[in-house]
Amino acid sequence: MKKADILVLDFGSQYTQLIARRLREQGVYAEILPFNVSLDEIKAKEPKGIILSGGPASVYANDAYFCDKGVFDLNIPVLGICYGMQLMAHHFGANVAPAGHKEYGKATIDIQNDSDLFKNLPKKQTVWMSHSDKVENLPQGFEVLATSENSPFCVFGDEKRKFFALQFHPEVQHSEFGKSILKNFAKYACNCDSVWNMGSFAKTQAQKIKEEVGNDKVLCAVSGGVDSSVVAALLASAIKDQVVVVFVDNGLLRSGEKEQVEYMFKHTLGIDLISIDAREIFLSRLAGVRDPEQKRKIIGNTFIEVFEEEAKKHKDVKYLAQGTLYTDIIESSVVGASKTIKSHHNVGGLPEKMNLKLIEPLKEIFKDEVRALGMELGLSKDVVYRHPFPGPGLAIRIMGEVNEPSLELLRKADVILIEELKSSGWYDKTWQAFCVLLNVQSVGVMGDNRTYDNAVCVRVVNASDGMTATFSHLPYELLENISRRIINEVNGINRVVYDISSKPPATIEWE
């Protein structure tokens, strides 16, 4: 079992993943586990510290979430955040009740006492609050470390036992010194070394791959995106002669994608590629299907069928490698009190019975860590920093039924969007950009004629790891050019809208 420097117990906060991400950014390996994980499993991870995340519940309610009480008897530091703070207060005998004044948004805290948490940090800080309950009295054995206008016990702690509790969220960017607070907890309270990096990860994973695979061969599914490209490069670095790299044209690709992928693997990566034309089978199975979850399941099942059929042609192929990321695992599973957001075709979309064993060497890392790993493995910047493209492809960018006419419309619009972003210098400034074909027609006028055609949505976002994202504030002139070109050059589209939703509450992809 892989060890973790810091374990984050998830009580359902939308920000839980950010806690792990902020620690990893500073070289500390953090892992997320459900709040009700057994004490034995926690001990097996040999953590140097534990963080209790925020969450939507109230500790005094009948449906409150509680971790094993033994967490506080492990003689290791514990940090409670928001709900985790209230849980700690409740555990040690303090009273938690509904707050007369709810706090959502920015607040100012004043540091009252010296603490490892605030070492080398200003006495007054802006933080991000998101709570409707309050701690009414200080737990026995703790002291107040910081206060805010609405919370006299905003931060409290026990320096001797290294137990700390924060009412605010240090993991979000709005808490100006939040990242430093988490670093201080890891460094000074937990004595963690900042040794987690992609160089060490690459060596460790290569060795694990060799040990797991042995003399068998691995079928590596690639899409041309950064995730699968990095998986292929990592496998090649570990067991090059045992890797069979397969690209499936499922008919759901962007314009020119197949040719780009074939060129990249042959000339940029130097890896032989088997290309399979499976357009007909994918599109026939998707015919008439409108539900996004059903689309994902169909695509996942069909991919496996195609790969298993190909595996039969290659002696000793026993494994299927995929570019599943930590974010995929989180969004496709119920972690702690968190809810399943959507299944991913390479996680929740897999059939229960699969004749190939699954190997997912990237499942412990976030997207930006994948990019860093790609650079570590010697991939080109063009490959590493290409915008993400979902495994189900354009199927989840078409609202409703997927068919060839809709795919062609979407491809043409998408080409124009990317051309405009690149020519204006905005492509490299954004995390992801794509068009969504809406299941909506609208009235328009072109020349002297009435039109009743499709509407397309342009989605461009900024992000660092894909767990959260904000819409890109593109210049109006650029948006106007994108809209004008799509409407004028793509017959069948007469309206373009721009998605200004952030994640959360929206996801990056529409389906």
UniProtKB/Swiss-Prot annotation:
<feature type="active site">
    <location>
        <position position="169"/>
    </location>
</feature>
<dbReference type="InterPro" id="IPR017926">
    <property type="entry name" value="GATASE"/>
</dbReference>
<dbReference type="GO" id="GO:0005524">
    <property type="term" value="F:ATP binding"/>
</dbReference>
<feature type="binding site">
    <location>
        <begin position="223"/>
        <end position="229"/>
    </location>
    <ligand>
        <name>ATP</name>
    </ligand>
</feature>
<keyword id="KW-0436">Ligase</keyword>
<keyword id="KW-0547">Nucleotide-binding</keyword>
<feature type="domain" description="Glutamine amidotransferase type-1">
    <location>
        <begin position="5"/>
        <end position="195"/>
    </location>
</feature>
<dbReference type="GO" id="GO:0005829">
    <property type="term" value="C:cytosol"/>
</dbReference>
<comment type="pathway">
    <text>Purine metabolism; GMP biosynthesis; GMP from XMP (L-Gln route): step 1/1.</text>
</comment>
<feature type="active site" description="Nucleophile">
    <location>
        <position position="82"/>
    </location>
</feature>
<dbReference type="Pfam" id="PF02540">
    <property type="entry name" value="NAD_synthase"/>
</dbReference>
<keyword id="KW-0067">ATP-binding</keyword>
<dbReference type="InterPro" id="IPR025777">
    <property type="entry name" value="GMPS_ATP_PPase_dom"/>
</dbReference>
<protein>
    <recommendedName>
        <fullName>GMP synthase [glutamine-hydrolyzing]</fullName>
        <ecNumber>6.3.5.2</ecNumber>
    </recommendedName>
</protein>
<feature type="active site">
    <location>
        <position position="171"/>
    </location>
</feature>
<dbReference type="InterPro" id="IPR022955">
    <property type="entry name" value="GMP_synthase"/>
</dbReference>
<keyword id="KW-0332">GMP biosynthesis</keyword>
<dbReference type="InterPro" id="IPR014729">
    <property type="entry name" value="Rossmann-like_a/b/a_fold"/>
</dbReference>
<dbReference type="InterPro" id="IPR001674">
    <property type="entry name" value="GMP_synth_C"/>
</dbReference>
<dbReference type="InterPro" id="IPR029062">
    <property type="entry name" value="Class_I_gatase-like"/>
</dbReference>
<dbReference type="Pfam" id="PF00958">
    <property type="entry name" value="GMP_synt_C"/>
</dbReference>
<keyword id="KW-0658">Purine biosynthesis</keyword>
<dbReference type="GO" id="GO:0003921">
    <property type="term" value="F:GMP synthase activity"/>
</dbReference>
<comment type="function">
    <text>Catalyzes the synthesis of GMP from XMP.</text>
</comment>
<dbReference type="InterPro" id="IPR004739">
    <property type="entry name" value="GMP_synth_GATase"/>
</dbReference>
<keyword id="KW-0315">Glutamine amidotransferase</keyword>
<comment type="subunit">
    <text>Homodimer.</text>
</comment>
<dbReference type="Pfam" id="PF00117">
    <property type="entry name" value="GATase"/>
</dbReference>
<dbReference type="InterPro" id="IPR022310">
    <property type="entry name" value="NAD/GMP_synthase"/>
</dbReference>
<feature type="domain" description="GMPS ATP-PPase">
    <location>
        <begin position="196"/>
        <end position="386"/>
    </location>
</feature>
